[in-house]
């Protein structure tokens, strides 16, 4: 119950703070108890306490009224706290209800308004107004340590941002009194700042003075005292001047938080530039007595309060002027910032009380200098109620010659700010509301720039087949005659057509030169060719090797549509898609460019598969293909030529799909070749084309959609399991151009995958599943995919007979049940319905209900799972933190693991792991570690959902905490005799070379964890062979001879003990330059009497190395017999060490050179006792040693 007690104490502290009208925020330790804001808890964190008090009639101070949102949050807290057993009510405290309430939308909104320690949105206004942007930056706290170090918290966080309880209430000068000064901060480690702020003086700023000047008031009552200039170093709470002097306080138009650019690089760069602009303002020099001539500004008749560097006070006057009851504070440049905002998105009212007339700051919405020179009437400022304007007085300010330079520098910086941020969205209205939402189905997240997001939001233009061309080809006239007539027509108008083509080509080249994706073609060696064109090397582009593909049958009419499609294809990114680098239209030739991948295509890899790991590799490759295709289909992009030649694999066997899109060009090529007798024989990869494609080419009605790619994927999946057998080599029957192949059953294919292939290869596109469904099936655990039994031999023979007798369209009518024989008259529709039902059951294998689980708790956790899904669907940093913290709370309780498994929390953690935030990834890795430690089923699910792929990526992390928890996870997956499958997967995914490279890490704790992980992995024979082949033994030997720590010796020796029995490793040690030092190191381990584990490791290693003659001399010189006597005790029950020690002595006794040493040692007597050992093997070894020693 410790976690519940901590959560309860935190909630009690927040409730008490809310009832007292104050909120304490701890910036660096959000989990500590904040019951007393003035106590020193020994931490170095800085606490900022907001407190606002106003004098009442009796001279006592009272707290301000809380907002409606605070009251609502307080009541919700009180209602939950009332269920705690410490109260009078019964029922107890339920932290699941607390999680649900805290994760509600209303709770999120209230926490943003009332608790500044929450992560708030970093926003830029629609016109980039500097004042409102500064306001947003001041109110922003970053929980992320990296961002928090970059952004400095402002002193304006010490003000209460809540609105006054009654905005229309005014305070006259007769009953106003001077507020007491705040007490100095206590001299403690935790600096507590309490701001008790006086009411400000409202000052209106007119245009340059044109009215009559009034004399200055007496210095004794209305004299203005200026603060000294601030120091040259930049402070964290510098202010900015007003946006427009002539137009009063502008009404700022803001971007909604849903559309705000949160924590992106552009926002941080813009914020940094704002800091530079603010710092350029500098300080206001102190006036030199009466020597400086004042400059005129217009103020109200209320005297300006005297401002000093240390305190802020206001004087009372008898003038019947009214001011609003607002909070104010002094900034280093002498400005008073009034904040009547009730929420984060309200405008900021900045009013200047310094003697310096502020320079108008031009913004994107302000008029040009020429327009501002003309006199314009000041726009009235909107107020809640109509109030009479107070009389004004002209006050002079001193002028400094440095002001002009500062103003000029500010104007230059603003211009630079506009130019450098011109690519940002300035208004939410620029976003297309009809644009589809980008859905990432991959296991990797790509943060996109605003420009890339705009390109991805464009919907692909739907292209339909050219029916007119097809009708002409399929008409009554002969095909050759049609071509001849067309050529004759072209010749008759050749001059005009050539001129039009030249003009059109020049226009296209002029248009594409302005595109960012334009690349000048530089063809080189030809790599290959296919149906649609020829592929060649194209040199270097942006430090990467690229290849170019020249497309066949390109028409000028398709150019405008291709421009749109190129922009969309260039913008999309996916880890398994070979991105389009650019394109060009040169000399009536269309060329596309992609990155050059060193590797092989899918055909070559499948033919060289290892039968032992065949199923796991096929499922992984299929999953990556399905993930990439699902991503393309989410943009309505059809590949239309998915076959092994267009699927590349690099040296790490990672999938890259190329030649996607451009369906109009592919259709045109296929039509010309299909309808031409001369080109028809040049058609390649026809077995991967769906039947509806041939129907379109043959003149039938209809078209095709994304389901043609599903058909191609079904053929690919079948050929992966068939390996050497190609579908085109089988017996076939051609109908309307489409070839029906008689596919034999595959004995190595799981029955589940076989049914999936049948659905994908259905002649009816509506029966084929989507790639989203396919992806979910392939991501199921391996035991789930293999749980269905394959048909018996008798059923397989029956299926083969049915396939030979029936037409291929009726192949799907065969039985899909693994039980008894089925009715042969079952229709195709019924069988397909049964397949669909079984697939639906397969999609949700974890949706089982354990009767032993609490139903009420199950419902609550399912509700929490739905809320977490909603938060992840809107991946702001705030939402991701809340989702991660919620899962952390649930994982801490081991009793919740079964509920989390049933509610599908593991895929949610995988989705969080895709986010590019180190703290989120670290939290997810810890959650996986907790779940895998206590549940074997979750470990298998983690492995089958490609969790090991994620660990291979995090092994390359520069963050030591992420690297450490990754190594811990790998150790958990490898620890145990039944974890052989996990070790094999780590080997296949390339984990061994990564771990060997990390052995040189500078952190010793990480090196120890790597050694332990390698020790567990080296239990596998295949891992041992790979480790030795990659040179890992040399690194272990080097670490061993230089080790001076017993703990490090234990880890290194444990890892070497797994491979030292191999003959290749023994030869490597005996022939290496570390031989003598290694043998002496093992001797020192054998003589270590404090650690028995080290002695055993040394004994085993010496037994492996004693066969080398040079090593034998080192052993005899070190008096090895004395170290072995303790193992020759006849009363010892440990037979293994005794046999190992006898082996060492026996090898030494075989060499006559060592007989004198053995005779001189005290070994004869212990051997005589061992002759009576009950173990026959020990008796034979002792007799052999005594015979050798006594005979020589």
Swiss-Prot record:
Cited Gene3D superfamilies: Leucine-rich Repeat Variant, Transferase(Phosphotransferase) domain 1
One of the GO BP terms on file: signal transduction
Composition bias type Pro residues, residue spans: 201-232, 377-391
An MF annotation (GO) of this entry: ATP binding
SUPFAM superfamilies recorded: ARM repeat, Protein kinase-like (PK-like)
Pfam family, one: Arm
Feature: compositional bias, Low complexity: 26-43, 61-73, 154-175, 301-324, 362-376, 392-402, 485-498, 791-828
Chain spans, region Disordered: 23-90, 144-189, 201-236, 301-406, 478-499, 790-831
Residues of the Protein kinase domain: 521-783
Stretches assigned to coiled coil: none
Keyword Nucleotide-binding: yes
Nuclease among keywords: no
Superkingdom of the organism of origin: Eukaryota
Binding site for ATP: 527-535, 549
Keywords: ATP-binding, Nucleotide-binding
Entry GO terms, CC: cytoplasm
Comp. bias intervals (Polar residues): 44-60, 325-338
Domain notes: The protein kinase domain is predicted to be catalytically inactive.
Family that this chain belongs to: Belongs to the protein kinase superfamily. TKL Ser/Thr protein kinase family.
Name of protein: Probable inactive serine/threonine-protein kinase DDB_G0280131
